[in-house]
Structures are given as C-alpha cells and as structure tokens.
A protein has these predicted regions:
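Binding-interface segments
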Residues: 1-170
Length: 171
C-alpha cells in the first residue's frame, strides 16, 4: 500500500497480548497489529481515490473565528465556505472543525463539518488523559497519584477531523 513506518503517523506497530494462543512453553503469545495513523489514512485515500482531489483543507474552528458554510443550492452551484481567523493569538475554545475537498470539477467539491460534540463522540471511552487531557496516573514519592494534565487536545481534535475527512465515505 506504500505506507512507511519511518514517516510520522503513517503506520504504527501495536503489540497485543493474545490470551487465546499459547506458545509451546505455555506462555501467552503477543500479536503485532499494523495500524495506519492519520497521515497513512490520508496517503491511502489520496493515492487510491477514484477521483483524486486537487486540494484538501482541514481546519479547527475556534470560538473567536468566523466560519460560514456555503452549501450547494440552486443559487450556489459550488459547495464552499468563508473562514476568517479574527484573533490569531487568542482564538478561544475549539467549537468544531471542517474539511474541504476540492476537485478539478468544482461542482463535486465537498464540505465536511464536525461540531465539537461530533469530535468528542469519536473519543474512546478509556482515552488516555496524556493525549486528550484530563487525569492520568503518575508516580510521586513511590506512590500512585492522579494528576491533571493538559494533554494534546487540539492535536487529537485535528487528528479526528482528518480521519473523518479522509474516510472512505468522503473521498
């Protein structure tokens, strides 16, 4: 498929303990799953698309930004959007994200919009606080304690929007 483990977020090797299989010595075996990351999903979607997009834009929308979707209708032949960053250095809280897929034939352009609720719906139930922010377990003075971490919330939201935009149903 052309994915490269040396590229960021292309392909990751994830080991799992397989409790159903035993080795000859009777110990549990491990299985390695090769999981494509969001850049790998993007690569596959663009490389194997029936109609290759000219450009794909993926952005997060913050509370101080101005975002206006322009959906296709009888007066507007091409789906599009207006997006303006009003305060680049203090954009506020994330309110959602969008992806815009542009084709050579403009009438095929597609706008995918995700609210913050849609993004958080895709967050795993047992998501690590280290990534999404929140509480994580740490060791301090030989004891397990829960600490609050900022995590990588923006990056996780952007990754989630990218996964949706580059999914098979949208490309």
């Amino acid at each position: 498929m052309g994915l490269d483990m040396m590229q960021d977020n292309h392909l990751s090797a994830i080991p799992f303990k397989d409790n159903n299989r035993l080795s000859r010595t009777g110990t549990k075996m491990y299985v390695v799953n090769l999981m494509p990351g969001y850049n790998g999903i993007q690569y596959i979607a663009e490389k194997y698309a029936l109609e290759k997009p000219v450009s794909v834009t993926v952005e997060l929308v913050y509370s101080t930004d101005t975002f206006k979707p322009l959906k296709k209708n009888r007066e507007n032949r091409v789906e599009s959007y207006d997006f303006e960053i009003n305060n680049a250095f203090d954009r506020g809280e994330i309110v959602g994200g969008f992806g815009y897929i542009e084709y050579t034939e403009p009438t095929k352009n597609k706008l995918i919009i995700m609210t913050l609720k849609d993004i958080l719906k895709r967050k795993p139930d047992k998501a690590s606080g280290e990534f999404w922010g929140g509480k994580k377990t740490a060791w301090e003075k030989g004891q397990k304690v829960e600490v609050e971490t900022e995590g990588w919330f923006e990056e996780m939201c952007l990754k989630t929007v990218k996964r949706e935009v580059y999914s098979a149903k949208n490309m």
